[in-house]
Structures are given as C-alpha cells and as structure tokens.
Amino acid sequence: NASENLEAMLEAGVSSLKIEGRLKDSGYVKNVVSYYRQALDRVIAKHSDKYVRASFGVSKLSFEPALSKSFNRSFTSYFLTERHPENGKSMASLNTPKSLGEPICKVLYAKGKTIRIATSSSIANGDGLSYFNQQGEYMGFRVNRVDGADLILTKPISIAAGTPVFRTYDKAFDDALSGQSAERKVAINAQLWWTNGSLNLQLSDERGNRIVKSVDCPELDAAKSDQGPRQTQAIGKLGGTIYQLANAEVMGDKFIPSSVLAQLRRDAVIALDRAQRITFKRPLRLPEQADAPCFAKNLTYADNVANHLSRQVYEAHGA
C-alpha cells in the first residue's frame, strides 16, 4: 500500500503508477483506482506549481473509496521506505491467505444463532464477517438479520466473548459499486452575448479549445425580471454529453426564448466535440530503425531470448 507515500514518490520523479489487481473483480478496480485518484489529486492540489494531471475531466463518485473494503491481507509499504517490517508488522499474512477485511466489532456474548456485538459501524443483512477462533483458525459467517446490537445468523457458531470480528464483505458498499459508480465530466465555461444582429454562444474547455456558434437575432427585448438563472440553466443542460458547466456569463437583462438557447447550446456542443477530436494529439508509433545496433554482440541467458522470433530480431540487429 503506497498511498501514504505518493507525495514522496512524485517528488522522486515518479510520473506513472501501476495498480496491482490481477484476477480481481470490477468492484476491486473501481474502489482502488478511485482511492488512488483522490490521493493523487490531493497531492497535485497541494503542489499545483509542480504537478498537473495527465488527463482532463473530473470523476464524480457515488461512493466513498476505502482500501480496507477490497480484498487485502492487511497492508504494508513493503521495501518502499525501509528494508525491515515497519512498526513491528510482518510483511506476510501468516495467519491466513484469505482476505482479512476491516476490523468492525468485538463480541460481547454469543448464544446459538445470536451474537451480541459492540460496534460504531453499521452492519447490514448479508454482510460477510470473519474471526479467528481460539485455535487460531480463520472462520467466517454471513449475517442473516440485524436486530439492534444482535446479529442473527443462519446457524449456530462457537465464538468467545471479546473476539475481534472483521468484515470481509460489505453488502451496502458492494451494491454501490455494482451499478454506475462514477461519472466523468469535462468542465466548460460559457459566454453569451449579442452583437450586430447576432446572438453568440462561446464554449471553452479545460484543454484550451474554444468555439463560437451564432444565430440570427435582429434584436432582443428587455427582460421584466432577471433572466440570468434561467439562461444559465438552459445552457447547462448538458446531460448525455461529456461536459459540465463550470461558469457562465449570460445576459440577464434580456429575454431570450428557451428554444433559441437550446438550439444554440446543441450546435455549440457539436462544434466543441469536433474541436476536441481535431486538436487531440494521438501518439504515433515511430518507424523502426532497421540499422540500430544490438546492445551486445554476444548474448547470454540473462538477455531473455525467449523464442525464435526474438532470436530473429536480435540477429537482424547484429547479435
């Protein structure tokens, strides 16, 4: 878990981060990526003079990321800060290879299918909980029903008072991740003005794209009341697009029909989409340098000549 060391890593020159998640489900990916995205954004905001995001747009989450809620065997910084376990913690999960989960409560007493607990956390029907029994074996059970401080199970278990209990499956959290859990939007600014018989709308985005669309409008009537909020709302109806209105300069003292604003907005969004595609710089693969010399004339097992194809490449370059 490198989340607490991101600032030091960026200071050391790291600009690309890879999150391990082989064979993990979509919930794991959503949770962990979102957690690190927020952690990176905090570092970038703290040092805005040094760092900028490599991408544009901001994702709005429908959940609060928490690493402890995804598969883990507890956490360690590994060898990132020192060569021995920090704070006396082991670098391996010796008690169980399964996910330990988050500490959530302690058992007050247990009888039959009922366990009374002491906790400040909310537990829901369907949550998966685990514990170590008195023999050190890792055990688990599913909560069938919650009745105040009592957990009602589907079958009796033997668990001693004072036993710490962990949550390995948070049903409410998993439900939040199962649907659309994030929406990414690019912030845009809008400016509305009238000149020489033309009503104009300018949209500009975070990447510096700027477009203007106009409609013929010989004159505008004075408004009987402030039209600013209504005009801003009409321009900000961007559902179904990648955009989100951040700021708008409008003409609150003039009356502009909603249908005119709607058509102007639609035309402007289409033009901004086109500008996005035209100005996007796609990295191109460089042409192969056929006469590039191999790094060594004589190769060894350490150079990883894995098969006949890699052998052909090395030989073609002089090895």
Residue ranges of predicted features:
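Surface-exposed amphipathic alpha-helical tracts and adjacent flexible/coil segments at the periphery
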Residues: 1-319
